[in-house]
Amino acid sequence: MRTFFCAVLLCLHVAANASSESTEMKRAIDTMQEVYHVSFVYDSALADVTPAGRPLPDKTLAENLNIVFGGTGIKWEIKDEYVLLFRQNKYTFSGYVCQDNGESLINVTVYDKTTRTGTLTDEHGFFSITLPEGKHVLRVSYIGYEEVVKELDLQSDYFGTIYLKESTTALAGVEVTANLNDPLFTTQTGKVSFTPELLNTEFSLLSSPDLVKSIQNLPGVSSGTELLSGLYVHGGRNDENMFLLDGTPLYQVNHLGGLFSAFNTDVVKNVDFYKSGFPARYGGRTASVIDVRTKEGDMKEYHGTFSIGLLDGRFQFEGPVIKDKTSFSFGMRRSWMDLLTTPVLWIANRSFSDKNIKTRYAFHDINAKITHRFSDWNKLSLSVYSARDLFKSRVLQQFPEGYMFQKYEERDENTFHIRWGNLSVGLNWNGQLTPKLSGNVSLVYARNLAKYSFLSDESYYEQDKRVSMERMQRSNYSTIDDVGYRMEFSYRPAASHHIRLGSNYLFHMYHPQRIASQDIRETAGIADTLLSAGEGRYRGSEISFYVEDDMQLTEKLRVNAGLHAVLYRVTGATYHSLEPRLSVGYRLFDWATLKASYTEMSQFAHQLSNSYLNLPTDCWVPSTSRIRPMRSRQVAGGIYMKLPWNLSMDIEGYFRTTDRMLEYDTGGSLTLPADNWEKWVRVGKGKSYGLEASLAYRHAKNVFQASYTLSWSKQKFEDFYPDWYASKFDNRHKLNLMFRHKFNNRIDAYAAWTFRSGDRATVPMQYVENPSLPGTVQPSDAAGSWVYEKPNNITLPAYHRLDVGINFRRTTKRGFERIWNISIYNAYCRMNAFYTQVERQADGSFRGKAIGLFPVIPSFSYTLKF
């Protein structure tokens, strides 16, 4: 908090110095009075307005009056030897920016060339800009779309919808002029936005575009275990990332243990990723925020996308229900793995006379949304998201009488069944309340589920009559149910202020574990049954309020200041948190901006895991009376530059601390005890710091990006180890290189090379055998003990790989686009470390041996856009 107030005082000091520059208006007036021998009559408050320019020699009085006051909101009138100054009336131009099919667009720049002020559309495509009365020329631009220039003569408040057409010549990613979402113009540090075009032109693992794997390539982000969808941002852990899908929080965002993320990029409209400089409207996690917005659907025509790849297929379709009034968007993705393995197992089972194996794995995710517009400024939408993974395995074996000297025939059955996933439903209203005020209210429900069961049945038969049976059955059920609302308001009193305020509420129902077991022994018709069960259940409510103001204090200084307040109640405990947020941007030159930010974040939900594999056995637990909420503080700052030759460069540093981190320790067990789980966790703290740099070149045919991260990530759990030690994913160096080339409108290719320092692992230094005392018998577990220097004491070999791919495009006579993609993962077959084996040397010392699993992996996909 002390750092926050120091930053505020510094900001006020800079603002005070900047306001002193407003005396330029007084000097300009004095100069014209002296040169033209006139007297100015005006309200003294007008002297605080920054002049549009300075008086020039060899100009008439009227010409210089236009130079000084043009676009400032000050009107002038010459009467004899007097110049009368008075404020112009101001009016608000507001509305929505949409594609020509009615789909709203996010982060569109609306810029007034007359006053040299502008704004961005929000997450619902809404904008509002207050301008002086009179004539204005507005430029509306967005990457990948044709720019629209609109001339206005404002004599009253005006509402309008602006439609943009997709560009047929510009390559997605090419810069547009006056892009106010560019880091050069925003205050936030560590923010990156993704459009659908950008997501679908990134490297695609197994030829399937993936949002999380695109984020993994950013500086300051570690991917964790190879091929999995881990996100370790600025030293944070995988559970410290807030995923929002149309405003609804998600807990499980992976398929197949992380091989695929749970986002179908065909339905994604925009993604905002924050790793520092968090605005006050976000909360609930401590490391990052991923705000995903999905399509509403085409209001005019039907169209869609179909894609089939090596392991999965995707389908997306959208169109009008009532033209220009109601639209729908539907997307589905499903894996093919069960269809591929079924014939293989059928052939294998035919070769076994005493064994039958049935295995099935499949996943799907479904996105559905329907939107109705009551008017141009009032709409309602209902969205549903469902994601599910399913794995089944059943092995039947028969052993004839006499096998291994058995008296009876034996029949064994082992069944394993696991499913996990998400379900979320959101009802959202969005509308314009006044020309300067818009509102958004959502009712949300989310459910996270993980369930697995195991059955082992051994039966013995004599002449097809069962004589005995042993059955063991285990089941585990874990759920989280959230229900609540989100209320957001956006108020733009002037072009220099954008105020956001709102409230979020969630009622949490946690069931971390519901464990049941059953053991049955039956002999000669007499059964002996043993039952046991356990359940953990928690209820909690979380309500937050926030306010933030994005302020343009001077032509060069921009500030985003806000406060996020949270009240959290769970059985037996109540917590509250005040989280200040401050981001400052200062325009050093036309081509460079200096930024700094300070943020505090709290987290009331924790994921307990004994691995880094994103397993469904991982479960979520709330903060309790014994486990306090996690808290992080982060300072970040850097310089952002637009250089000649289509180059851009960013350099950013950060320092982050985390208190009350949790670490799960049950001696290697993957399942959490249902009761008293709090005694199985350690509480500690962490710190991370580093420097990030990125360089990008964008041209119509060539795109090159390079990023480098130098970072340290440490943690301390005093009950486990008394000093600071490196985190598992303390990757000192990380380098990403990407190049994409467009040969023509039909062929484009890309290559991406990734390098990072190796992950950390723990290897014992020696093994000490306990002495055996005469006349005593040592238990088997007391034979000796391992001696460790410290946790994560070795660094595995460096990780690096090359991915390449090529797209072949063709447009049919009917206007359909066909895309063939061929990709190669790990092109030079680097066997990077996936896990570590500990080997004992001849001299008694130990060494870790890195084991790699993933060689070169080719893949393909076919996409049809219709």
Please give the residue ranges for each predicted region:
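Short, acidic, small-residue-rich periplasmic hinge/interaction motif at the N-terminus
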Residues: 29-36, 72, 78, 83-84, ...
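Periplasmic N-terminal accessory/gating domains of Gram-negative outer-membrane beta-barrel systems
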Residues: 69-70, 120, 146, 182-239, ...
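Short, acidic Ser/Thr/Gly-rich low-complexity loop/linker segments typical of extracellular
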Residues: 114-126
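Transmembrane beta-barrel wall of Gram-negative outer-membrane proteins
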Residues: 311-335, 350-394, 417-445, 493-494
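Surface-exposed extracellular loop regions of Gram-negative outer-membrane beta-barrel proteins
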Residues: 401, 449, 516, 590-635, ...
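Outer membrane beta-barrel strand-and-loop segments of large Gram-negative receptors
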Residues: 482-486, 534-538, 624, 628, ...
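Gram-negative outer-membrane beta-barrel transporters
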Residues: 555, 655-657, 677-763
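C-terminal beta-signal and adjacent terminal beta-strands/loops
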Residues: 659, 746, 755-782, 797-803, ...
